[in-house]
């Protein structure tokens, strides 16, 4: 078994494709359950954000697992496999681990170094764990990933500027409006992104905030927090959107809705009612939703500036300092090496355990033979003989078993477990029983980024009629 990643992100696809693939929280369980219907997939979890849709899975065979995941995403998005392949990237084994570590560290984000993605990884893992779709392999990977993300943010200055998609978008809005002080803003969505937007607006000196949400209670809670910061805030339901837009200078929307919540008619009506245009009072709309919350046609209205995720990516403040990025990548590389060393060591552990069990069985058999040959041996003498024999066996096995774990943990050490089984004629069934009993996880590794496995399942991750083409991101 090994880890397979199938993904599409802002680096490989335009927003229109990400919109089609977007998976909201209510759909994630269904997507994972469909992926797990394949007998070749044993564990799976989905990471779906404004910038990416990625499926991480533990698979028995590369091409079969890849085909199963690709087909589920193709059916979900309505895209043909060929269309999906154009924008997809695939990572396998070591490369999948490295990619997830980099994602959690903010290295693959639209705004490099942002911390929100670490929370998104945590929520994706928690959801998969609650649904029992992650086992030992993805559990350990997710736990290590969260640790790596925290380490990068604590040991580097990659997030020193506190940049995020929200902060960069509002920074653009602030420039367009000549500052946000005493301005009126509309925040659509009262979730985590809405709260983050409100915090940035408050720090920027915004004069008033309208919070809109489907649930009025959630909008009221967020509005209450804003008022505690000394800023005027009102809560509204979404059907009041056209009304509040007439007085808005800036709008931030990130709802996760499957269709636009801000229509061309809404914005046109607001501008016409207030007799606003580009010169009298411009309107800046930050659409941070995925799928998009704002009808793209809004950008064609005079006096409206539409800022989306693609625009945010082009902003200089979305890119961290090269030295900080290099430091973060160094940590990720070291963590990947450490993780894989631990997994390789874990792979040989069941064999070592089986060897020690074989030795214990031999000792017990010989002690029984001794009892039959020397029935007059008293219990004290027998106990001393038993302790002596066990000490001899333990001392003989200690150094080689410790050393073989060290050798197996190094790159290219995959063959040591097999050599040990061959030398001591250990039954593979016994070794498998130890591994299945939960001693330590077994992990198969050994692929470079963007390449497929060598062996029975196929020579490479090249394109096939039923599987997407693994490509460099």
UniProtKB/Swiss-Prot annotation:
Q: Which residues bind NADP(+)?
A: 189-194
Q: Which UniProt keywords apply?
A: NADP, Oxidoreductase, Porphyrin biosynthesis
Reading the lineage from the top rank, the first entry is: Bacteria
Listed pathway(s)? Porphyrin-containing compound metabolism; protoporphyrin-IX biosynthesis; 5-aminolevulinate from L-glutamyl-tRNA(Glu): step 1/2
The UniProt annotation places substrate binding at 49-52, 109, 114-116, 120
* PROSITE patterns the record matches: GLUTR
Q: Which residues form the active site?
A: 50 (nucleophile)
Give me the ranges of the annotated region Disordered.
445-473
Enzyme type, top EC level: oxidoreductase
Supply the CDD domains for this chain.
NAD_bind_Glutamyl_tRNA_reduct
Q: One Pfam family, short name please? A: GlutR_dimer
GO MF terms, alphabetically ordered: glutamyl-tRNA reductase activity; NADP binding
Read off the domain note: Possesses an unusual extended V-shaped dimeric structure with each monomer consisting of three distinct domains arranged along a curved 'spinal' alpha-helix. The N-terminal catalytic domain specifically recognizes the glutamate moiety of the substrate. The second domain is the NADPH-binding domain, and the third C-terminal domain is responsible for dimerization.
Quaternary state and partners of this protein? Answer: Homodimer.
Quote the function comment for this protein. Catalyzes the NADPH-dependent reduction of glutamyl-tRNA(Glu) to glutamate 1-semialdehyde (GSA).
Family the UniProt entry places it in:
Belongs to the glutamyl-tRNA reductase family.
Protein name per UniProt: Glutamyl-tRNA reductase
User: Which species does the entry assign this protein to?
Assistant: Mycobacterium ulcerans (strain Agy99)
Write the gene name: hemA
């Amino acid at each position: 078994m090994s880890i397979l990643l199938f993904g599409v992100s802002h680096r490989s696809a335009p927003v229109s494709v990400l919109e089609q693939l977007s998976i909201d929280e209510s759909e994630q369980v269904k997507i994972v359950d469909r992926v797990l219907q394949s007998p070749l997939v044993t564990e799976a979890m989905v990471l779906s954000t404004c910038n990416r849709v990625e499926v991480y899975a533990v698979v028995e065979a590369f091409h079969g697992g890849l085909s199963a995941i690709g087909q589920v995403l193709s059916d979900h998005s309505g895209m043909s496999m060929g269309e999906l392949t154009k924008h997809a990237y695939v990572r396998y084994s070591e490369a999948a681990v490295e990619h997830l570590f980099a994602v959690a560290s903010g290295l693959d984000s639209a705004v490099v170094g942002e911390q929100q993605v670490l929370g998104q990884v945590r929520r994706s893992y928690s959801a998969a764990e609650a649904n029992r779709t992650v086992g030992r392999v993805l559990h350990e990977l997710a736990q290590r990933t969260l640790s790596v993300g925290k380490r990068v943010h604590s040991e580097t200055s990659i997030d020193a500027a506190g940049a995020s998609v929200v902060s960069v978008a509002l920074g653009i809005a602030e420039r367009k409006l000549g500052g946000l002080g005493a301005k009126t803003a509309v925040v659509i969505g009262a979730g985590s992104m809405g709260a983050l937007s409100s915090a940035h607006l408050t720090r920027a000196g915004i004069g008033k905030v309208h919070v809109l949400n489907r649930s009025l209670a959630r909008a009221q809670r967020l509005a209450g927090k804003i008022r505690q910061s000394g800023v005027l805030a009102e809560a509204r339901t979404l059907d009041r959107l056209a009304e509040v837009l007439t007085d808005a200078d800036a709008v931030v929307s990130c709802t996760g809705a499957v269709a636009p919540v801000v229509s061309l008619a809404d914005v046109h009506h607001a501008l016409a009612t207030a007799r606003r245009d580009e010169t009298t009072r411009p309107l800046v709309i930050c659409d941070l939703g995925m799928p998009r919350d704002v009808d793209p046609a809004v950008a064609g209205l005079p006096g409206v500036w539409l800022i989306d995720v693609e625009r945010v990516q082009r902003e200089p403040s979305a890119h961290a300092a090269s030295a900080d990025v290099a430091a973060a990548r160094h940590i990720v590389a070291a963590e990947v090496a450490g993780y894989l060393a631990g997994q390789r060591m874990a792979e040989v552990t069941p064999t070592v355990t089986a060897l020690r069990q074989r030795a214990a069985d031999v000792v017990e058999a010989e002690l029984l033979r001794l009892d039959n040959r020397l029935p007059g041996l008293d219990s004290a003498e027998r106990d001393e003989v038993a302790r002596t024999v066990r000490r001899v066996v333990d001392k003989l096995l200690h150094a080689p078993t410790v050393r073989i774990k060290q050798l197996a943990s190094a790159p290219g050490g995959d063959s040591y477990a097999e050599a040990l089984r061959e030398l001591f004629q250990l039954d593979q069934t016994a070794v498998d029983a130890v591994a299945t009993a939960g001693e330590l996880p077994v992990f198969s590794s050994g692929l470079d980024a963007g390449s497929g496995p060598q062996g029975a399942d196929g020579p490479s991750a090249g394109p096939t009629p039923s599987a997407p083409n693994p490509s460099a991101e």
